[in-house]
Amino acid sequence: MVDYLVQDHRFLDSFLTLLGAAIATADTFEARLRFGRFAGMICSDENTYFLRAFEALGVSPAQRSEPADTAPTAGFKAIMREAAATRSYAAALAVLNVAEGLYLDWALKAPKPMPDNFVHAEWITLHDNPAFQAFVAFLQAELDRVGPQEAALASDFYQRTVALELAFFDAVYPEGK
């Protein structure tokens, strides 16, 4: 779990850049509000979770910063910033749909009852709660609404993000480890 959390925490800055782009390029006030609330949760609850988890697992600041990014982590940081730089709402939504949709799908399949250790249990509840479920449904509806106008761009970002997700999990959880 340490390798996963270290690498996952590394793209929070790029993720916030992507959320900022979604706020800036969304075509409705309601969408901007939803993204703003979600960005607030990432900056508070989720970032605080990472810091508490690192402390509980004995992960020092040096252990968080010294290992190089895995290739998929570097790729994720790059694709989030690339999608943001397009100034395309559809591109931002494509990346967000893959990332957040996979978190929700994973969390919904997590074993019940919850693990006793907060490091595992809270990571699940951050990604399986009514607000997060509603946010992922919102992302899907927004991509369905605006994606067709930029279908090639949205599809390109979506497919590349799916490939990065698979590579990310293969890198942090190699077979046999």
Feature-to-residue mapping (PLM):
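Long amphipathic all-alpha helical oligomerization modules
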Residues: 130-159
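Structural helix-adjacent loops and short alpha-helical linkers that scaffold large soluble proteins
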Residues: 26-30, 152-155
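A generic alpha-helix surface/boundary motif
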Residues: 16-17, 48, 74, 137
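Alpha-helical bundle segments that constitute or directly flank the non-heme di-iron/ferroxidase center
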Residues: 1-25, 44-45, 94-104, 169
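Surface-exposed helix-capping loop/turn segments at secondary-structure junctions
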Residues: 21, 25, 29, 59, ...
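Short basic/hydrophobic patches in alpha-helices and adjacent helix-turn junctions
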Residues: 109, 125-129, 141-148, 167, ...
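Active-site-proximal alpha-helical scaffolds that flank and shape metal-associated catalytic sites
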Residues: 6, 30-131, 159, 163
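A cross-kingdom marker for long, charged
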Residues: 161-177
